[in-house]
Structures are given as C-alpha cells and as structure tokens.
Amino acid sequence: MKTLGQFIVEKQAEYPNAKGELSGILSSLRLVAKIIHRDINKAGLTNNIIGNSGVENVQGETQMKLDLFAHNTMKQALITREEVAGFASEEEENFVAFDTERGRNAKYVILTDPLDGSSNIDVNVAVGTIFSIYRRVSPIGTPVTLEDFLQPGHKQVAAGYIVYGSSTMLVYTTGNGVNGFTYDPSLGVFCLSHENIQIPPNGKIYSINEGQYLKFPMGVKKYIKYCQEKDKSTDRPYTSRYIGSLVSDFHRNMLKGGIYIYPSATTYPKGKLRLLYEGNPMAFLAEQAGGIASDGKDRILDIQPKELHERVPLFVGSREMVRKAEEFMREFSEE
C-alpha cells in the first residue's frame, strides 16, 4: 500500500526543478489532519471542543469550539513549519503574513475553511477541513499582500479537503487528477485508497437544503421539481441527500455521481458559501475529477474575487447534472 508521503515524493520527482515547498505544505496539512482527527474522535468525551465558543467570526456566525481549535491548529502548524508566506481563514477577518525571513521567501499562500460543518460535531456527523493553495504574485522576499489571496480559482496550484467520518480521508489535487488517502490510525499514516477519482458524468443524487425552498430563485425551484419528477428516459426521480456539511456532501457525490447546490436566496442574495475558502477549492477538485462547477451561470474558477470573504452561489458535481441546472437558471432568470 502506497502512503501519502511516498506519493508526494514520487510526484515531486516528476518535476526536476521542484524544490519541495509544495510537498512541505502537504506534509504540514497531513499533520493537521492527524491532530484534528485525534480530537474529533474524543469529542463526546470532553467539553473542550463541543458546543458554542460564544465568539462570532467575521461573517457574524457563532463559532463552535471546534472551529477555533481547528483554526488555531492549522495556523500554528503553518507558522511553526514556515512553509507558506501567508495564511487566510474563514474564521479570521484579515490574512496573516508570515513575516520571517523564511516566510517572506516562501512561494505560496494558503486559504482554508478549518472546519466545515462544525455544527454537526455534537451529533457525530461527518465534518471536514478545506484548503486552497496559490503561488504568490507579490515579490519574493517581501511580506505577502492582499493581492496574493485575491486570485481567480484557475490559478490554484493545489486544493483539497480532509473528511472526518467513519474513516478520515485526505483528498487533494495539484492539477493532475484527484487522489484520496485513508488514514490508518494503527500505523499513523495515510494510505492511497482512491486513485485518480472520476466523478460520473451523471448521477441520481441532488444535495440542497430544501427547507429553504421558498427563498430560492425560480430556476432552482424548477430544477428541484425536475429532480423529483418521474421519467424513465432520464432515470428520475433522483434521490435527495443533504448532510449539511459541504465536504461530506461533495465527497459522496464525487464518488457516486450527483450535484451539490447552495444557491443564492432572498436572505443571502449573493450566496452563502465563501468563494475563496469553499467555492474555488471544490471547483478545482470537481474539474480535475471530470465534473464542473458554476455559480449557476459562470464558471467558478473564472471569477475574479474582490474581497477575502466574498460569497458565491455554488452548483458543483456531475457534468450533465450541473449543465441541466444551469439550463433552468437561464430559462427562469429573474433579472
């Protein structure tokens, strides 16, 4: 069985001029995954990471204790190892420049949602960590700037997630396909378990919070009805599956075929998910696995972000299902 460490070394060897910086970042993320995995598995035995922290994040959302733990774990691991020039998190208002000699000379910045779906942890539902890595655009040797983080998603050099479920998996891409590694706690290593993952071009699963139906755009309402209608030629009706954790829903749909939708709504007209921390990394993974991702109209990876915590509607998953949803969005446009 090939380990994540072996896989990283093999891939680095394919690029003779590579100096190992990206490999070092992935190694840091591997450590973060192990630490968060350890504490999540003890969540029911301690009050230290369960429940609300009483603190609000920059979006005005109440942070769970585990949000803060995951955020601080990720941040500290990156600071200690000095593998990146800067760090931005969904849980922190501003980016952090690692203003040390090694940090200023690092080539990459990382953006992260340290713990997606954290409200589920109290009831033992799978949660995840999402990450996105870019090559900085500011001069090497200087502190990073906001422009290093405000890059369109097609400029990502790597992205992935860690899902903490019945097993812990690290799934990532560096632009050459998607591979998944399952954690073996008895050995303390991630082993290659899902090589060259491909999203089926079509599927039978649609994932959306139907409790918000009345607030959705007409195109989304019509697509939901389409999914529910009986039609032998397209093997409908489809199955509704919604966990409430982007990582978990995306992971299932990537393996089985399906579409995940978090649209705009009357209560959040620009969408609710964050472009830089959730939309871009999931879109990069989807495209690398043969799927697509859009905001209902345009390709997610082509959007030029204007601010660090910008929100976006997200339609992501099997190619044919996303295209069909886009058809409904165009046909029933409310502009």
Swiss-Prot record:
Gene3D superfamilies in alphabetical order: 3.40.190.80, Fructose-1,6-Bisphosphatase, subunit A, domain 1
One record GO biological process: sucrose biosynthetic process
Pathway(s) where this gene product acts: Carbohydrate biosynthesis; gluconeogenesis
SUPFAM superfamilies per the UniProt record, alphabetical: Carbohydrate phosphatase
PROSITE patterns from the UniProt entry: FBPASE
Cofactor or coenzyme needed: Mg(2+)
Gene Ontology cellular-component terms listed: cytosol
Catalytic reaction(s) noted: beta-D-fructose 1,6-bisphosphate + H2O = beta-D-fructose 6-phosphate + phosphate
Amino acids binding Mg(2+) 1: E90, D113, L115
One GO molecular-function entry: magnesium ion binding
EC identifiers of the protein: 3.1.3.11
Sites where the protein binds Mg(2+) 2: D113, D116, E278
Cofactor info, note text: Binds 2 magnesium ions per subunit.
Binding site for substrate: D116, G117, S118, S119, N209, Y242, K272
EC supergroup of this enzyme: hydrolase
Pfam families: FBPase, FBPase_C
HAMAP family xrefs: FBPase_class1 (MF_01855)
Protein name: Fructose-1,6-bisphosphatase class 1
Gene symbol of the encoding locus: fbp
